């Protein structure tokens, strides 16, 4: 009894001490954790949707919003239906590999018979995919492509030449996965009689090795192929496998732009696959139709740009008459275009000084497309429907904040996920016209906890740069802000091409830490300068061939602007960034040494020659073509300028931005007799997490700020 009372006393004391404060302990204990709805998917009848719950995969009614049943009981990480919804693919155990790839154990359950079959005899596979007729599942293991007959259980091996760090079939290599945004590089035809896949020969790509220290007597090594800027990439080819013959034939792409094959797309036609291909410099992209009976290739059209095309996420949908929709930045903003079946432009569907940021689908009945846009300002994302024939548009989401949608198959309903900078995520069931049916989930409890601990929200402003642009920015001020006082300023940014940090959306990540710093007496701010997204291509692509130049100029300009405000102590301005943001912080502490007193760079690129080919060359061309662009924007070249307090942080097992970057920068600082702090995280990747890593990391950064800014 005495022991229980002691525990209660301690708990009450802790509560009283921290009740009005956002602490790191509370942040990392999950005290402020919000709620969500996992695995939302519409069923083909348009009347029901599914979600993942602790007890299984639950079926709900759109009309009543009530749960009807569990279609599968048990605990699953993810699921995928066959096209006819007779079977379901269940992921039961996964092991992450890189950004998107993972090994997993999968089961297929027949929902009519209740029979369950293990994929690949219960062994791990990658990227399984139902055939459209639901009789088979294709998958990859050890870089080879297979398919399994779901009636007999028979496994057929399609390729035999797969080999680690040499040949990959149907799966992205490291750089494709990282920069084109997906791991699967194969697709079934709609009639299920053929598979088109990409074969990657990475045997000539330079190999990177990373020591893994672990707890063994001798460190192990992680070796994989990583093409750096200007170096050899995988040689890729498109392959056609026909199930009736059991034979594979190469698809001849020699007449087209074929250096990269980022996308393999299934269409509604039974004997057709579409490939999106690109040149190495990524300023021209072909859209190609492949006849899977003959192997013949037809070019629909070529998209070009005088700088680059974002080939990582093309919007392409074929309609019933074989015409198609395509998103392009050709008029200075990302908009939707409609082409006929021969690749001739019919019309531009959306227009204006705003951008289409996501595409949800097309309703053939109403002739409407459903899209997410920045129509209500570049810091907001809203959902609209647009008639492709007459151009009539209707807003169907909240008019501000960050809104996304998950539609029923017939577009009669959708589940809206929305937030603002001051309101956490809410999930609302709506009719297709935007009328609310029911709020499914809110995070009022999370918000009340934060408000009780004096949470402050972001104030949105604009700041001019030297080019005459108005840069989006936010600022967080202490609750008891006194305009007559001078506050130290802590700036955060990312600044990468097409990115956005100044958004009217809820942030469950760094925003809580920033609140912690605000409560310590700091003002925190963020500025999206030139190169960032959602303000048109002129603003985004001005950085071409000079990545880092205009971005750091704008951050320095913004810091000076803040320093000119009466409430900012211009002698106490600091910066923090991760990855590209760490690169910018490194430039701020060197090229901006007279402005910034302290900086924290986490996992920074310090020389673009060390980063991967697809990303870097998209914005910079190769080092051979553009040596000045690479060298004049490397913080290593300006190590002699460092004046302030600098904390450099990197995970030793970073497969993305290699530890080498921080080592080279450190050596340059050392040889210039510069004092700085360095923190290496053993065996941690680009995210630097696991166990108590994040709490320790953020305490380290907090202490550095308190002691040096």
Positions of predicted regions on the chain:
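Bacterial Sec-dependent N-terminal signal peptides
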Residues: 1-22, 709
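Predominantly five- to eight-bladed beta-propeller fold
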Residues: 30, 93-98, 102-105, 158-186, ...
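Non-catalytic accessory segments flanking enzyme active sites
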Residues: 38-41, 47, 51-56, 78, ...
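Asp-box/WD-like beta-propeller blade repeats and closely related beta-sheet repeat scaffolds
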Residues: 100-146, 154-184
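Beta-propeller domains
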Residues: 199-346
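Serine-hydrolase catalytic core recognition
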Residues: 207, 262, 270, 404-709
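Short loop/turn segments that connect beta-strands within beta-propeller blades
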Residues: 62-65, 110-114, 150-153, 242-246, ...
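Beta-strand C-termini and the immediately following turn/loop, strongest in propeller blades
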Residues: 50-55, 81, 88-100, 137-144, ...
